[in-house]
Amino acid sequence: MPNRLPMPPAEPLLNAPEFTVSELSQSLKRTVEDAFGHVRVRGEISGFRGAHSSGHCYFALKDESAKIEAVIWKGVHGRMRFKPQEGLEVIATGKLTTYPGSSKYQIVIEALEPAGIGALMALMEERKKKLAAEGLFDEARKQLLPWLPEVIGVVTSPTGAVIRDILHRLEDRFPRHVLVWPVKVQGEGSAEQVAAAIRGFNALPEGGKIPRPDVLIVARGGGSLEDLWSFNEEIVVRAAAESMIPLISAVGHETDITLIDFVADKRAPTPTAAAEMAVPVRSDLFVEVADLARRTRAYWQRAHESRRSELRAAARALPAAGDLLAIPRQRLDSAGAALPRGLKANTHAHFRRFTAAGAKLTLRVLHGQIAQADHRLTVCGERLGLSARSLLRQRRDRFAGLEVRLRASKLSNAQAQRNAIARQRERTHRLAERANRALVTLLQRLDARVEASGKLLSALSYRGVLARGFALVRDEAGHPLHSADSVGPGARVEIEFADGRVGATTDADRPAPPAKRAQQPKPAAQETKPAPKRVGKPVDQGSLF
């Protein structure tokens, strides 16, 4: 028979403490919580199917050889910046405890973060595919930026260097009205604030108290992928996609890529570049407008000269009214002059034939034929006269109409030339008025400068000192005297006051001043300086009067 271990005595088992199932579960719960407290656990999320109807989240954390149940309460889940995703490797921070209902230990997660850059990149790629499948990144959805916006809305932190860079760049290029919606750009709640700012700008009414922006800039400085993660959240991406205002994303540096860059209407590598995309350079616009104005003036000048040359050529090509009527008038005069001669010649010819025929006829027949011929001749003469007068009247009416049309054409051309001359005269008058106004402005400025110079000259003149009660003493040559030693006894001097000059002679009994050393000639600028103020009166100085 196989060897068996001896059974322990029954008496010690009877002394072991007795627990109910609930008591044992609670004891194990206290032991686990006291022994471990808060822990950080690294593992892969498994079994996550989204939040429960109660708002709590239940899943498991596992690695290659073990698994632990995890729970996130509703309030904690709502405050989390990083939400759990199935299959994502994370680092969970929470409190280790047990669930008495099934005697299983679990971790109550209070904070969740991805385990390294790889996990974040995988999550970002998954979101990118999901949003792209919804068509949020399609180029057809994107709007064109306004050429020169009146109001620019900026969503960024109000205390960072980003807003200063944007404002400075806008000031350099083309100052515009800027509205800043201050938000947190990283950390808990930052994604919600950015999305709310984008939707808030879009909710502003047209013509309201706060102007509605024409373009939006969502900006943030550079940082790590974790720092920029708020701009990868779906709430921010969807808010940017729903924006009816054209949006420029300027998150991070040129090498930083976030999901908002794919849905924005334009992506700028830096916040400064976003400001450059929003507005053109004002000086370039001034140059372009000036060039267009110059080209327009040159075009109209060329067109005006061309039309004037064509008008002059057409006027030279037109014949004079008298020349048009000269030849028809000459023909009419020739026809009128030849008509009586033709009538006479025709009458003589018929008369000769009549005479020849009359010799062959009897007197009675001859008289009858003569009477008939005379009647026919009279009728023909009347008809010929009527026809000639009618033809002459028609020709005159025709030539009168031609003359009226030619005069009207000439008057119309002359009126057009007078109108052009009047326009040029009016333009010259306007230019002269502008030149006169500029000349008046220049003269006013020069008068102001002359007046200011006169005031400065009066302030610096020695006459201002005389007006305060001082006097200027000169010798007979008119040179100012700077000391009492320079005046000999009995010398003639001239004293200038503010209101005039008087002559004076120094005391004769005053001792002569000592001989002065030869001094270097002073510059002319120093001769006009007033004598230095003396304290008291020298004992040897006599009265000047």
From Swiss-Prot:
Q: List UniProt keywords, sorted A-Z.
A: Cytoplasm, Exonuclease, Hydrolase, Nuclease
For bias kind Low complexity, which ranges apply? 515-525
Q: Organism's domain of life?
A: Bacteria
Sections of the chain in a coiled coil:
none
GO:BP terms for this protein?
Answer: DNA catabolic process
CDD domains, sorted: ExoVII_LU_OBF
Q: Which GO terms describe its molecular function?
A: exodeoxyribonuclease VII activity; nucleic acid binding
UniProt catalytic activity: Exonucleolytic cleavage in either 5'- to 3'- or 3'- to 5'-direction to yield nucleoside 5'-phosphates
This protein's assembly is summarised as: Heterooligomer composed of large and small subunits.
List, alphabetically, the InterPro entries matched. Exonuc_VII_L, Exonuc_VII_lsu_C, OB-fold_nuc-bd_dom
Q: Which family does it belong to?
A: Belongs to the XseA family.
EC assignment:
3.1.11.6
Q: What class of enzyme is it?
A: hydrolase
Name of the featured protein: Exodeoxyribonuclease 7 large subunit
